[in-house]
């Protein structure tokens, strides 16, 4: 019995190690639930986060952007077609080729729940669907007006903490995520994640139960506040300290929160999380998994028969020789040594887990020794 228990324990350890290496793609669901001109800052909040995740590599195809009102085209906007999150108006958040997937009255509690649970009509385009799998990390960022255990949508309906928790559990049961970062900027934000019970969720809120979240500053010409303090704190960290190769962790971001500057007490709740925030890179949620390098250098390719001498191909100051292997014998373009001619491709390297091999060996030995004894004694 002891051998059997040890074997099961080791199998569980193997599953944990495998799960930690299963993260292959990142998705972001970014939503501003408010409408009306005086809530301009909520759209600026979400567009600021949207810009950060795009800068760090998440493509629009893996970002669901939901904005409940069109402030860029509002008749009160002194700067038509723009949205700013700073009074200096140095960066137009609406001019970054944004792709809004749900807007106006499309942004409802029902639409949000259907998006998370993939209970959408069959003809719903991919841009309006959360096409995640068990290897997906999901960032869910919400901003708007809220209260104890709810957040308002369109100033007409509410999403409760219970409904949110049940939706996340459905995602879990259908194996549609690896880990979730739930971040919310609203009054009494921390109450919105108290009912979540699904595993591997890191929840961060802007304010405690019974307290409000506050705007950071206003633009005199626009006439309203342009960003909230909690989101401003996050963007200040992300934009100034994080790039696509950053090794900063979620704990570093959490440690940067200053309640005195934010004017509220942010909350952090790891919910059945298998990793510590110290071990979770910020780019595990805000960046792209693939490390993509863009090259602007021109490559002088030679057509067959143009030059029979050894052509050189320059790429990143490295010279590759085709070794006269380019031939055109009338039967088509042939290269006898393709690797010597083509530009190099970077080999994909995956993290190895040597401990898993040791554990596997121990499990096999345990079974080979323990099972015959167990069978002879209990299975007669």
Curated annotation (Swiss-Prot):
Endpoints of the signal sequence: 1-19
Pathway stated in the Swiss-Prot or TrEMBL entry: Glycolipid biosynthesis; glycosylphosphatidylinositol-anchor biosynthesis
Location(s) in or outside the cell: Endoplasmic reticulum membrane
GO molecular function, one term: GPI-anchor transamidase activity
Record keywords: Disulfide bond, Endoplasmic reticulum, Glycoprotein, GPI-anchor biosynthesis, Hydrolase, Membrane, Protease, Signal, Thiol protease, Transmembrane, Transmembrane helix
Glycan-linked positions: 307
Tagged with keyword Phosphoprotein: no
Gene Ontology biological process terms from the UniProt entry: attachment of GPI anchor to protein; GPI anchor biosynthetic process; proteolysis
Subunit structure: Forms a complex with PIG-T homolog, PIG-U homolog and PIG-S homolog.
Protein name from the UniProt record: GPI-anchor transamidase
Source species taxonomy: Eukaryota, Fungi, Dikarya, Ascomycota, Taphrinomycotina
């Amino acid at each position: 019995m002891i051998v059997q228990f040890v074997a099961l324990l080791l199998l569980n350890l193997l599953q944990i190690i495998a799960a930690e290496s299963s993260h292959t793609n990142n998705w972001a669901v970014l939503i501003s639930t408010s409408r009306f001109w005086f809530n301009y800052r909520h759209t600026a909040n979400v567009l600021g986060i949207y810009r950060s995740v795009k800068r760090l590599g998440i493509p629009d195809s893996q970002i669901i952007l939901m904005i409940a009102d069109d402030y860029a085209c509002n008749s009160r906007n002194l700067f038509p077609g723009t949205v700013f999150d700073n009074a200096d108006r140095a960066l137009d958040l609406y001019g970054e080729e944004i792709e809004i997937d749900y807007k106006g009255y499309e942004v409802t509690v029902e639409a949000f729940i259907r998006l998370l649970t993939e209970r959408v009509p069959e003809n719903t385009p991919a841009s309006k669907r959360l096409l995640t799998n068990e290897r997906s990390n999901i960032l869910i960022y919400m901003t708007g007006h809220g209260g104890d255990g709810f957040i308002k949508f369109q100033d007409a309906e509410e999403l409760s903490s219970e409904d949110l928790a049940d939706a996340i559990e459905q995602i879990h049961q259908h194996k549609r995520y690896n880990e979730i970062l739930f971040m919310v900027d609203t009054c009494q934000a921390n109450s919105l994640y108290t009912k979540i019970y699904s595993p591997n969720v890191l929840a961060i809120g802007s304010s405690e139960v019974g307290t409000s979240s506050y705007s950071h500053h206003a633009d005199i010409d626009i006439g309203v506040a342009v960003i909230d303090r909690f989101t401003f704190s996050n963007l200040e960290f992300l934009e100034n300290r994080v790039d696509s190769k950053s090794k900063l962790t979620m704990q570093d971001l959490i440690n940067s929160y200053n309640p005195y500057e934010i004017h509220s007490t942010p909350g952090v709740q790891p919910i059945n999380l298998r990793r510590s925030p110290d071990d979770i890179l910020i780019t595990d949620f805000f960046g792209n998994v693939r490390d993509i390098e863009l090259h602007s250098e021109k490559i002088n390719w030679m057509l067959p028969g143009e030059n029979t001498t050894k052509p050189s191909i320059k790429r990143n100051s490295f010279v590759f020789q085709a070794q006269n292997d380019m031939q055109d014998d009338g039967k088509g373009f042939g290269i006898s040594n393709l690797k010597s001619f083509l530009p190099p491709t970077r080999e994909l390297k995956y993290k190895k887990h040597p401990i898993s091999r040791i554990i596997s060996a121990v499990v096999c030995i345990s079974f080979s020794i323990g099972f015959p004894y167990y069978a002879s004694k209990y299975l007669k």
